[in-house]
Amino acid sequence: MLVTGDLIQDDTPEAYERFRELMLPLDLRVHCIPGNHDIRDLMRPVCCRPPFSYCAWEEIGDWLIVGIDSCAEEDAGGRVTIDELERLAEIVSSSPAKHVMVCLHHPPVPMGSKWLDTVGLRNGDEFLERLHTLERVRLAAFGHVHQEYDAEHKGIRIIGTPSTCRQFQRGSDDFAVDENPPAYRRLELLADGSIHTELVWVSE
């Protein structure tokens, strides 16, 4: 399971422990990355204990999956630091995997929503260019936007997933929520580098 940030709403250690308790019965490895609403110092102790991991990587078949931190201090928008870009490059270069999926919280491309695009990834162009230099990156997956997104950027699939809470109205100039229910996404990463995906909307 990949959790692309904003794990909790109230900034307490107990909230992260509650998240952990809710996930454990699924009996899955849970890869977590921080979102702009997360408090890293509270999140790490909980999400570094197996079967959870924090900004980690894993090789599954022909794929390498890497979680990176795109959060910036005191900024709802994000930035992938030079150190984090170098960490990503080192992980990819040391892996024999044929295909790479990178997970982050903030969208590296505009969403076409005036207010939401002010809190995207500040260095999205730089981030995408670095992904292209790594050559094996096939997919970048993100959260943050509370809506569906699926497009391609110079051969790299860019996918955003709706929230497991409430959704934002697509294309809106100002903050607005819509009536869509919570959702999650299933991903099938195939040996030839292709990607099959399905959105699952969860009715109450």
Predicted regions: what they are:
Residues 77-159, 193-195:
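His/acidic metal-ligating clusters that form di-metal
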Residues 55-61, 149-153:
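Short acidic-hydrophobic surface loop/beta-edge motif
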Residues 15-29, 119-128, 155-164:
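Short, electropositive alpha-helical surface patch
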Residues 62-71, 101-104, 156-162, 198-199:
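Active-site-proximal beta-strand elements of phosphoester/diester hydrolases
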